[in-house]
Amino acid sequence: MATLFIADLHLSQQEPAITAGFLRFLAEEAPKAEALYILGDFFDYWIGDDDPQPLHRQVAGALRQLSDNGVPCYFICGNRDFLLGKSYAKRCGMTLLPDEQIITLYGQPILLLHGDTLCSDDRDYQRYRRRVHNPLLQWLFRRLPLRLRLKIAVGMRQQSQRSNSAKAMTIMDVNQETVCATLRRHGVQRMIHGHTHRPALHHFSLDDGRCALRAVLGAWHTHGSMIRVDAQGIHLIELPAHPAEDEIITTRLRSANLV
């Protein structure tokens, strides 16, 4: 058996094909795993565990079924869903992990993280990140009316899109020195992360000559992306394209016993 990792699905009501692709992944790939790790930006935005969107209930039910069937699920928050809390995690049957988590698979320690903290050249974003991760600010935000929270989230998303469109792509990728420093700080040689939407397996050497590996998950825009870790190593896998709209409609009708 293997351990599976995914990130950057950006699930939303506006992208039903991505949701359908994820549900297919839960039905076909995830049940065969020893565990599933979701490394952030699972949802396109998250304004609180009390948001009653039908999508949130649907996803929670599917993850709970996976967990109830014996596949543990773990979650690290991303820059889009860092407000996802214990209440929703409990509904999903998944365990919340800190921003940086070391796990050991087949005798090898691996550092897991979303990946945004590695993009240290993007100083504007890092300043923004420090602000929105302020516990007091988060406490206040969660107590605002749901409609106001949504309005703020939409405005911040639009501002982020405008800001990113003016930035060089290199600024929004990881800084290699930060990568090496993070590995040294944790005393490991392997990491798995998402965030950059640039799926790849990067092999490089640390300052002391030891070999290191940085495995990067892809986004789920048109098809799924996962990393599989088994006894043979770390594998980056591209999943099939998401179901077409007519397939999604047929699946919904079947689930409602209308076809």
Swiss-Prot record:
It is an enzyme of class 3 (hydrolase). Its cofactor is Mn(2+). Its EC number is 3.6.1.54. Mn(2+) 2 binds at D41, N79, H114, H195. It holds the Pfam family Metallophos. The keyword Cell inner membrane applies. One of its GO terms (molecular function) is UDP-2,3-diacylglucosamine hydrolase activity. Binds 2 Mn(2+) ions per subunit in a binuclear metal center. Substrate binds at N79, R80, D122, S160, N164, K167, H195. One of its GO terms (cellular component) is extrinsic component of plasma membrane. Keywords: Cell inner membrane, Cell membrane, Hydrolase, Lipid A biosynthesis, Lipid biosynthesis, Lipid metabolism, Manganese, Membrane, Metal-binding. Mn(2+) 1 binds at D8, H10, D41, H197. It is a peripheral membrane protein. InterPro entries: Calcineurin-like_PHP_ApaH (IPR004843), LpxH-like (IPR043461), Metallo-depent_PP-like (IPR029052), UDP-diacylglucosamine_Hdrlase (IPR010138). GO terms for biological process: lipid A biosynthetic process. Its main location: membrane. NCBIfam families: lipid_A_lpxH, PRK05340.1. HAMAP family: LpxH. This is UDP-2,3-diacylglucosamine hydrolase. It comes from Edwardsiella ictaluri (strain 93-146). The gene is lpxH.
